């Protein structure tokens, strides 16, 4: 069974991230084991990398910044992030299954 670096909770996307700060550019590298590897330019100092990551994810998933939350990993490279109702999905992410009510 394939290890998944994301899951859905209703319409919210939960992503397990492996962050590489102080990179040359901001980019999503792709799956890295059970995490999604992301590189950002911000340094891991005084929360700058976390703030930059959340802004980058908001832009990538086409949501407002207040729809992106850091759930865990404030001082670690391994993070869990929640994105509320993402408008755009990355390749490899399947949309949530919507249950119909009869």
Curated annotation (Swiss-Prot):
Similarity section: Belongs to the UPF0235 family.
GO terms for cellular component: cytoplasm
SUPFAM superfamilies: YggU-like
PANTHER family: UPF0235 PROTEIN C15ORF40 (PTHR13420:SF7)
Organism expressing this protein natively: Nitrosococcus oceani (strain ATCC 19707 / BCRC 17464 / JCM 30415 / NCIMB 11848 / C-107)
Protein name: UPF0235 protein Noc_3000
Alphabetical list of HAMAP family matching this protein: UPF0235
Domain of life: Bacteria
